[in-house]
A protein has these predicted regions:
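Sec/Tat signal peptide C-region and signal peptidase I cleavage site
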Residues: 20-26
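Short strand-edge motifs at loop-to-beta-strand transitions and within beta-strands
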Residues: 431-435
Length: 467
């Protein structure tokens, strides 16, 4: 075949793909992962939390395991005399019930092994995040692999390693050069050795787990990616770093109060509205020989902040709309294989706060308030619906999350009075559908689904957004 023929075929393929509606290029197998650390850690609320999450149709749980929480003498500057690869030397009691509860329900578990770390496991032993020792981390991962074994479906290394509360230093003091990416690379390689030594040589391990935006103290996610993979600003290899072989790339694509369609000006930031930036960066890194081609993306932590957060919080109605829109954006990207919901209940307020801003400085991204009161997003989560205006049309995307196969679902609309039926359609085998309707000013939409037991379930009413 001549050199021109593949180019013609590739061009034809691109034209054909471009002609498809956006959702037609969606991931063929996108899963939803839930994270509810407070509710699942508390024995008094654990069973109820598991049952409620299960009622949504979710079958995957993310747990962040902090090394310092299980290690002996974590606050000591001097390492205790023990075999760090022996799982019996650690206290796993904070995490075992969560893992076992998920496994008993047939769920998949993503375990993120992260800092902060034991003080004795850092260079200089001055705190719990500065330059963790790769050799010590390897030993800990070996112990974790031996303890949990195949109960864990996927592992991930470090939570937000581009954030100073989890890893230091982020930058050099003199030239403000990013340092955390190379520190992290060594920790990831140490973890791979640890899994092999712990009897899991074929463990599915995700890399990165980066937060979405950079600052003077936080390394931007794409800057972090390039540094971790030994690439310059143009994605050319620097030095002799070997190719890494993670099972996927993990990222936390949080957005701002502007909503999921927000596009940050900083080109190295990656929020949900510009997830294509991460796809492009991964493809360029693959062409440079730094990672495998077509690495799948796992959006392992996500949520929409609501009131009473006074900085990033949106109204309760917008929280429901924005979360559904964000899930649609993830669904539309064929490289995104996993999306997530962070929190069942909001974080509790800070009792020692001296201002309203400090009082709600945690996460208000839950489906319920911190007291357990249902938010509108609790109703929309099992039946998300996102409506985009496209000229004279409205593109409706929805999901019956609890569905176990193709199922009928009805779209209803209101213009301020009662609800009327717009149409009934049948979802695909995973519960998704996409359908167009004529735009009518003032209309709002919701999903209505009849469960197998005969119950009629209504989703939250959503507005139409211009993409």
């Amino acid at each position: 075949m001549s050199r021109i023929a593949p180019l013609i075929l590739a061009l034809c393929a691109l034209i054909a793909v471009a002609a498809l509606p956006g959702d037609a290029r969606a991931s063929a197998d996108q899963s939803m992962t839930f994270e509810a650390p407070v509710d699942l850690a508390n024995p008094a609320t654990r069973t109820q939390a598991f049952d409620e999450i299960s009622s949504f149709g979710v079958k995957s749980l993310r747990i962040v395991m902090l090394w310092q929480n299980v290690a002996p003498a974590a606050t000591s500057r001097i390492k205790p005399d023990f075999d760090a690869t022996d799982p019996t030397k650690y206290d796993w009691s904070a995490y075992d019930p969560q893992v076992d509860g998920a496994v008993a329900r047939g769920w998949k578990v993503l375990l993120t092994v992260s800092g902060p770390v034991p003080r004795w496991a850092t260079n200089g032993a001055k705190d719990n995040v500065t330059r963790p020792k790769p050799k010590e981390f390897q030993a800990f991962v070996t112990a974790a692999a031996r303890h949990f074994g195949t109960k864990i479906s996927r592992w991930s290394i470090w939570n937000e390693p581009n954030q100073p509360q989890f890893l230091l230093p982020q930058y050099s003091a003199a030239k403000h050069t990013p340092l955390s990416p190379r520190i992290y690379r060594n920790l990831f390689l140490a973890a791979e050795r640890g899994f092999a030594a712990g009897g899991l040589p074929n463990a599915q391990v995700l890399i990165a787990e980066t937060s979405p935006r950079g600052t003077g103290k936080v390394v931007a996610p794409l800057t972090f990616l390039r540094g971790m993979l030994c690439l310059d600003a143009n994605y050319h290899k620097q030095g002799s770093c070997a190719e890494l072989h993670p099972a996927g790339y993990a990222h936390h694509a949080y957005t701002t109060a502007s909503g999921p369609l927000f596009k940050p000006r900083q080109p190295n930031d990656v929020t949900i509205g510009v997830i294509s930036r991460l796809v492009t960066a991964l493809d360029r890194a693959a062409r440079a020989g730094a990672i495998p081609a077509k690495l799948p993306i796992h959006l392992t932590e996500f949520g929409i902040q609501s009131t009473p957060d006074r900085i990033q919080g949106v109204s309760l109605a917008k929280q429901a709309d924005y979360r559904s829109i964000a899930e649609r954006l993830a669904y539309q990207n064929p490289r995104v294989v996993a999306f997530s919901q962070y929190l069942l209940r909001d974080d509790p307020p800070n009792p020692n706060a001296t201002s309203p801003i400090d009082k709600y400085s945690g996460f208000e991204s839950g489906l319920r308030t911190n007291t357990g009161k249902a938010k509108p997003v609790l109703t929309s989560f099992p039946l998300p619906l996102a409506a985009f205006r496209q000229g004279s049309k409205v593109s409706l995307w929805g999901l019956v999350r609890v569905a176990t196969g193709a199922t009928p679902v009805t779209v209803e609309y209101t213009s301020g009075g009662g609800f009327k039926k717009l149409f009934t359609t049948t979802t695909d085998a995973r519960g998704y559908f996409t359908r167009d309707t004529t735009f009518r000013s003032g209309r709002r939409y919701r999903l209505t689904w009849t469960a197998p037991d005969g119950r009629t379930i209504h989703g939250t009413t959503t507005a139409v957004y211009k993409r």
